[in-house]
């Protein structure tokens, strides 16, 4: 991973998961069952370059939900919140 790249997993935005299970946003802006395509679409809508990969979150090795590598120079937590607000799949 190069400088300025952030790896995003769909579990970061999943309202069904607890924080201990990998959710990184508050439930009120989390989505119901997001997948890598939803995250990628949200990033493209925000104008952020990204690339999808067929990898899984280390804690969720049995779920092959994919991951997204986004080119972003700011803080990862700020990017995660921007993406969470842009994802269309809601509760």
From Swiss-Prot:
- What biological process terms from GO does the record include? SRP-dependent cotranslational protein targeting to membrane, signal sequence recognition
Q: Does the keyword Membrane apply?
A: no
Q: Name one GO cellular component term.
A: signal recognition particle
Gene3D superfamilies attached here? Signal recognition particle, SRP19-like subunit
Q: Which InterPro entries match?
A: Signal_recog_particle_SRP19 (IPR002778), SRP19-like_sf (IPR036521), SRP19_arc-type (IPR022938)
One of the Pfam families matching this protein, by short name: SRP19
Top-level taxon in the UniProt lineage: Archaea
Q: Which GO terms describe its molecular function?
A: 7S RNA binding
Q: What is the purpose of this protein?
A: Involved in targeting and insertion of nascent membrane proteins into the cytoplasmic membrane. Binds directly to 7S RNA and mediates binding of the 54 kDa subunit of the SRP.
Q: Spell out the subunit comment.
A: Part of the signal recognition particle protein translocation system, which is composed of SRP and FtsY. Archaeal SRP consists of a 7S RNA molecule of 300 nucleotides and two protein subunits: SRP54 and SRP19.
HAMAP family associated with the record = SRP19
Task: Return the similarity comment.
Answer: Belongs to the SRP19 family.
Q: What is the name of this protein?
A: Signal recognition particle 19 kDa protein
The species is Methanoregula boonei (strain DSM 21154 / JCM 14090 / 6A8)
Output the lineage of the source organism: Archaea, Methanobacteriati, Methanobacteriota, Stenosarchaea group, Methanomicrobia
Name of the gene encoding the protein in the UniProt record: srp19
